[in-house]
UniProtKB/Swiss-Prot annotation:
Swiss-Prot/TrEMBL keywords: Ribonucleoprotein, Ribosomal protein
Name this polypeptide is given: Large ribosomal subunit protein uL22y
Protein family per UniProt: Belongs to the universal ribosomal protein uL22 family.
GO biological process, one term: cytoplasmic translation
């Protein structure tokens, strides 16, 4: 059994999925996941498919040094920095589909699901080496990541009963 960093508030109305040691850049995947927080499942899948087709960009907020600007991010972030991380989008999309099928097996309403928790952690770096001039050797590292997400059904709030307001009596 895999340990998640957070338990769902209602385990019977949620589905989980995670990927460990995924060979995809941590920084790009973190920005992709951050853009999907609290998004409905259908909207998130459409958004990632648009990213793969370069119709919408992922806004880069934390790891944004040297990232160019694009008009596709203007309404989502003040400085308009964004990219189209295809591999990260594909990995997260596959994980969303996995969680969706887990929800179907549990008997949840797929149209009513939203991403209640998504988190990306750094995995152990994979070391390689590159050979430089004058007999030197430099490290050539890759930065894989762990992704976990929880889909939950939206809870409809209990409707408040109408208050019967009693008019105050007039003093005689």
């Amino acid at each position: 059994m895999v340990k998640y960093s957070r338990d769902p508030s209602n385990p019977t109305k949620s589905a989980k999925a995670c990927g460990k040691d995924l060979r995809v850049h941590f920084k790009n995947t973190r920005e992709t996941a951050f853009a999907l927080r609290r998004m409905p499942l259908g909207k998130a899948k459409r958004y990632l498919e648009d990213v793969l087709a370069h119709k919408q960009a992922i806004p880069f907020r934390r790891y944004c040094r040297g990232v160019g600007r694009t008009a596709q991010v203007k309404n989502r972030q003040p400085n308009g920095q964004g990219r189209w991380p295809a591999k990260s989008a594909q990995f997260v999309l596959d994980l969303l589909k996995n969680a969706e099928s887990n929800a179907e097996v549990k008997g949840l309403d797929v149209d009513n699901l939203y991403i209640s928790h998504i988190q990306v952690n750094q995995a152990q770096k994979q070391r390689r080496r590159t050979y430089r001039a004058h007999g030197r050797i430099n490290p050539y590292m890759s930065n894989p990541c762990h992704i976990e997400l929880i889909l939950s059904e939206k809870e409809e709030p209990v409707k408040k009963e109408a208050d019967n307001v009693v008019a105050p009596r007039k003093a005689i």
